Amino acid sequence: MAFTEILPGIHYVGVNDRTTTRFESLWSLPYGVSYNSYLVIDEKVALIDTVEVSFGEQFIDNIRAILKDRPIDYLVVDHMEPDHSSSIKTLRLLYPEMQIVGNAKTLQMLDGYYGIHTLTREVKEGESISLGQKNLSFYMAPMVHWPEVMVTYCPEHKVLFSADAFGTFGALNGGILDSQLSLDHFWDEMRRYYACIVGKYGAPVQKALQKLSGLPIETICSTHGPVWQQKIGRVIGIYDQLSRYEGEPGVVIAYGSMYGNTAQMAEKIARELTVQGVKNIIVYNLSYADISNVIRDIFKYDTLIVGSPTYNGELFPEVGSLLQKISERCIPCRKFALSLIHI
């Protein structure tokens, strides 16, 4: 079996990005990020999603290393966000007979983004395409985290191609499968990815989890991060917990401070909570903290304390920015305290 072969006839052809510093120009990438794409090879060949176009040359090399001169029959587009779709025009030039498969919203976006409206095939909920011995079935997952999102399932191998669902920040360090990688940092990066990218859409994520719960799944192929096989239960559990907005016991103290007074207050609160036996306390100075880590931990823990001085008669700007991001993500079910110091 070739190194890229996840299962018989299913290959990884994705790429690592270790140069982009901020995902969506917002969220830091200390460990990089992967853009994952997969070939399913049978009597016919399907490619599941593409990669960021700036890595297109490497992507095409990965495909040709496996297919040689064999054509791609189908390109399945589970997600139209440009980090997964911007290589479509290149592929259409290289494989002009390739049929592009997507749902109605996908095909509208395909035309709007790239002017492609020929050799397309619309699929609906539960429909399948036969590749020979392997079949691909399609299930809609709208607003996880874009309106056109769907997932693709191969029942013969019990593989779910999950688009951005179950994804994580972090490039792949040599391996592809979870069994080949050190996963220590991926768990926090998964929570950070969910909180920043998917966090607003807990209800749609729950609907998708319920819809897919009846499928036997032994491999999850997301568009970001490792291919999951050994840790599927933990991965689904994290997404389930986060999308229910169920925090673990713990406290996030986030503050802004101009002259040290709010900082002193935050430290005293943290110490007193410790005296009272509270565990898992994290204190963030919002003028220095990576905001994506703060949002991650607000999703992770069940209590949030925010301290702010006033600034021009309003909240300190960094505190106001955090509260806006919390509001955007509709985070319910939290114990919350806000303290203002008028200085």
Where does each model-flagged region fall?
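Conserved small/polar residues in nucleotide/adenosyl-binding loops
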Residues: 342-343
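Metallo-beta-lactamase
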Residues: 4-8, 101-222, 228-230
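Conserved beta-strand hairpin/beta-sheet module of binuclear metal-dependent hydrolase folds
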Residues: 3-63, 151-154, 158-162, 251, ...
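Active-site neighborhood of phospho(di)ester-bond hydrolases with catalytic His/Asp-centered motifs
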Residues: 48-50, 73-80, 100-103, 160-163, ...
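N-terminal beta1-alpha1-beta2 submodule of the flavodoxin-like/Rossmannoid cofactor-binding fold
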Residues: 228-332
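Active-site metal-binding motif and surrounding structural segment of the metallo-beta-lactamase
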Residues: 43, 54-101
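Short acidic loop-to-helix transition motifs that present clustered carboxylates
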Residues: 81-83, 107, 286-292
